């Protein structure tokens, strides 16, 4: 496996593969890899001849300096895992490589509307940081296809929209969330939980499934449903941060025409912010007039 931290040698290798007619898949990560990331890698392998991964903790997408400082960095272990998965190349740039003039002078990519609603409303600038770094990585790696986890549902929607708006020639593949045996969505942040917190963490997924069952049973008083779910989280000493019920296609409020909804949840467990989501199939709305 090739490991590059500089842009130029990476580009030369990519060009060589392209000349050979190779199809290239890309998996951008922030490191601290777990089974969820490795599932992205395996999915990428199914879509291409060459798999490229990146490991870069992107400072532009962090609102909280402590969160950036405390984010787990395990480069040696990550490289071992990627080697075991037969990844062809890993790109490990520093902030100085990605942002040579500093964040203040970096040209940014801002996807309107979707970057400022839901999680974007409470984390201003976060999604601009995501879209900027992903766009830059796409320009560096020039992939044919890129794989992203559905756990970060709004992020996936943002990237799909950016690809459309910027006319990028990249196929975006969403990969279902990978979960622990107890239902907790796999995340690098899970490593920051204490043993006691880890035991309580699955309450987030259980509460989400409870909301889903209520919705599939016909309950549509969403504000009351969200408050009931918040109470369940508080009872387990989780602090609700965000709970949204939206149309899965538009990320707007559900309407009578909504047939597929998405539950988006975030809660603090101690100092760790956990996120999760679940798609809910609703009874199809009928617009047919009675004969």
From Swiss-Prot:
Catalytic activity: (R)-pantoate + beta-alanine + ATP = (R)-pantothenate + AMP + diphosphate + H(+)
Keywords: ATP-binding, Cytoplasm, Ligase, Nucleotide-binding, Pantothenate biosynthesis
Residues bound to (R)-pantoate: 61, 155
GO BP, one annotated term: pantothenate biosynthetic process
Active site: 37
Places the protein is found: Cytoplasm
Binding site for ATP: 30-37, 149-152, 178, 186-189
Gene Ontology CC annotations of this record: cytosol
Binding sites annotated in the UniProt record for beta-alanine: 61
InterPro entries: Cyt_trans-like, Pantoate_ligase, Pantoate_ligase_C, Rossmann-like_a/b/a_fold
Annotated family: Belongs to the pantothenate synthetase family.
Protein name as it appears in the record: Pantothenate synthetase
Organism annotation: Aliivibrio fischeri (strain ATCC 700601 / ES114)
Lineage of producing organism: Bacteria, Pseudomonadati, Pseudomonadota, Gammaproteobacteria, Vibrionales
The gene coding this protein: panC
């Amino acid at each position: 496996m090739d490991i590059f931290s500089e842009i130029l040698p990476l580009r030369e290798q990519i060009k060589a593969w392209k000349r050979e007619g190779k199809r290239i898949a890309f998996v951008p990560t922030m490191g601290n890899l777990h089974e969820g990331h490795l599932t992205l890698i395996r999915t990428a392998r199914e879509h291409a001849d060459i798999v490229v991964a990146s490991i870069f903790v992107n400072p532009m997408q962090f609102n909280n300096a402590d969160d950036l400082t405390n984010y787990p960095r395990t480069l040696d272990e990550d490289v071992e895992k990627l080697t075991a998965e037969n990844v062809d190349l890993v790109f490990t740039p520093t902030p100085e490589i990605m942002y040579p003039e500093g964040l203040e002078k970096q040209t940014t990519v801002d996807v309107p509307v979707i970057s400022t609603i839901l999680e974007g409303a409470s984390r201003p600038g976060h999604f601009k940081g995501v879209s900027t770094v992903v766009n830059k990585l796409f320009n560096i790696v020039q992939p044919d296809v890129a794989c992203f986890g559905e756990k970060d549902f709004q992020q996936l929607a943002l990237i799909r929209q950016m690809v459309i708006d910027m006319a990028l020639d990249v196929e975006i593949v969403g990969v279902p969330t990978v979960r622990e045996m107890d239902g907790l969505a796999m995340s690098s942040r899970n490593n920051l939980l204490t043993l006691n917190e880890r035991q309580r963490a699955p309450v987030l997924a259980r509460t989400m499934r409870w909301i889903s069952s209520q919705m599939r049973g016909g309950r549509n008083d969403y504000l009351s449903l969200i408050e009931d779910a918040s109470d369940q989280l508080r009872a387990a000493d989780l602090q609700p941060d965000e709970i949204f019920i939206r149309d899965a296609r538009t990320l707007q409020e559900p309407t009578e025409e909504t047939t597929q909804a998405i539950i988006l949840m975030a809660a603090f467990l101690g100092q760790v912010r956990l996120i999760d989501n679940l798609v809910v199939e609703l009874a199809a709305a009928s617009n047919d007039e009675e004969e």
